[in-house]
């Protein structure tokens, strides 16, 4: 029993039992990213042991696709497939057997202003005008770079953004962090107010919000991202292991991820690995 003998087990998405193409892709990308992060941590090359019959497979997330990604990452791949009939397992589900794939992988940003509840009424009015206007300017800059959020929402001291990929989300999160740290004029905030920013990535359900009329996203991965934010240190950006893995798999070398350990998340969401996001060189 390989699973029973494993030293550790990662569950990429414990919130859903849906078997679709996105689930296979998500798990495969996290596998690749975690392998790359571990190789970087150990300052060694990435070597992969694979069991593959040499067949093309059925697309993204399959064995052939994973091997192609490993080779693209510069990994050494050793195939230990014995080629004997007794070692061939039952055929896995094909994409034709899977449920419809309507949950794209998206990156989720939650941010909260610490100290907001202690502001006076006139300070809240200034915060709403200056701070949120400044955030809107950051969104405009992201749009010019082709990295604008797919959805955005705010409620007083909270921000929620959804991005297409980890690169766009990481760049925006660090720009927001820097603007608050440096007390940029357009992001004027009282000194007692600090920002916490959290990032996570996973399959989500897109929908058109019938109340606002704008695109939005829902699902347990959205809730998971929200539970990271309360444990983030002030004026820092923290990310889930899934986000760090997907960023590593995508080859985002301009960022670094400092492992903070396994942390209890807010509202009894369990213990999960958390990383601090920084620019490389910080």
Model-found features: residue ranges?
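Cytosolic regulatory/linker segments at or just downstream of nucleotide-handling modules
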Residues: 234-282
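Catalytic NTP-binding/metal-coordinating core of nucleotidyl cyclase/transferase enzymes
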Residues: 97-179
């Amino acid at each position: 029993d390989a699973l029973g003998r494993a030293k550790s087990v990662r569950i990429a998405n414990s919130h859903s039992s849906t078997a679709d193409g996105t689930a296979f892709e998500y798990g495969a990308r996290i596998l690749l990213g975690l392998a790359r992060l571990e190789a970087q941590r150990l300052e060694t090359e990435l070597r992969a042991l694979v069991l593959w019959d040499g067949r093309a497979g059925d697309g993204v997330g399959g064995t052939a696709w994973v091997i192609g990604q490993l080779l693209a990452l510069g990994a050494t791949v050793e195939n230990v497939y014995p080629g004997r009939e007794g070692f061939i397992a039952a055929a896995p589900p094909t994409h034709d057997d899977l449920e419809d794939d309507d949950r794209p992988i998206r990156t989720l940003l939650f941010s909260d202003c610490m100290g907001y509840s202690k502001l006076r009424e006139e300070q809240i009015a200034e915060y709403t005008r200056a701070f949120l206007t400044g955030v809107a300017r950051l969104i405009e800059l992201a749009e010019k770079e082709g990295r604008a959020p797919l959805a955005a929402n705010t409620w007083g001291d909270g921000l929620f953004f959804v991005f297409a990929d980890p690169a766009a989300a990481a760049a925006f999160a660090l720009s927001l962090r820097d603007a608050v740290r440096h007390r940029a004029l357009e992001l004027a905030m009282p000194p007692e107010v600090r920002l916490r920013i959290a990032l996570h990535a996973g399959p989500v359900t897109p929908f058109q919000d019938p109340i606002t009329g704008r695109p939005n996203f829902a699902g347990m991965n959205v809730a998971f991202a929200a539970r990271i934010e309360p444990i983030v240190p002030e004026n820092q950006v923290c990310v889930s292991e899934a986000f760090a893995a997907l960023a590593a798999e995508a080859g985002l070398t301009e960022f670094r991820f400092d492992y903070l350990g396994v942390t209890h998340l807010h509202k009894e969401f369990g213990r999960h690995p958390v990383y601090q996001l920084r620019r490389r060189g910080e």
